[in-house]
Amino acid sequence: MRHRKSGRQLNRNSSHRQAMFKNMAGSLVKHEVIKTTLPKAKELRRVIEPLITMAKEDSVANRRLAFARTGDKEVVGKLFNELGPRYEARPGGYTRILKCGFRAGDNAPMAYVELVDRPVVEAEEEAVEATEE
């Protein structure tokens, strides 16, 4: 029986799951939006939300904990220098999950995971900047 067991197994062993969410958390911090399956997206929330909460208070101990959970200095830098200050006033709920249909190969439900309050650059502005250069 699986009574009181939290978290999804996702047909992986524990080390594979841990490595996958470490990579996904790093990608989400770097790109601020990623596309994945809906169950992975829901489980990723449990990984990334505590990281951002930790990044609100910049200390050596917190940076070391964040590095242990992401394994990437660039990600830790962005967490503490950009995301921590950005979400200083927000008491949780830093991510948004948007369903986006089903994958063509296996009909798996797909979703975008994005950070809320992220600066969105319009496609038209990018095109104008590219033509000016």
From Swiss-Prot:
<keyword id="KW-0689">Ribosomal protein</keyword>
<dbReference type="GO" id="GO:0006412">
    <property type="term" value="P:translation"/>
</dbReference>
<dbReference type="GO" id="GO:0003735">
    <property type="term" value="F:structural constituent of ribosome"/>
</dbReference>
<dbReference type="Pfam" id="PF01196">
    <property type="entry name" value="Ribosomal_L17"/>
</dbReference>
<comment type="similarity">
    <text>Belongs to the bacterial ribosomal protein bL17 family.</text>
</comment>
<protein>
    <recommendedName>
        <fullName>Large ribosomal subunit protein bL17</fullName>
    </recommendedName>
</protein>
<comment type="subunit">
    <text>Part of the 50S ribosomal subunit. Contacts protein L32.</text>
</comment>
<dbReference type="GO" id="GO:0022625">
    <property type="term" value="C:cytosolic large ribosomal subunit"/>
</dbReference>
<keyword id="KW-0687">Ribonucleoprotein</keyword>
<dbReference type="InterPro" id="IPR047859">
    <property type="entry name" value="Ribosomal_bL17_CS"/>
</dbReference>
<dbReference type="InterPro" id="IPR036373">
    <property type="entry name" value="Ribosomal_bL17_sf"/>
</dbReference>
<dbReference type="InterPro" id="IPR000456">
    <property type="entry name" value="Ribosomal_bL17"/>
</dbReference>
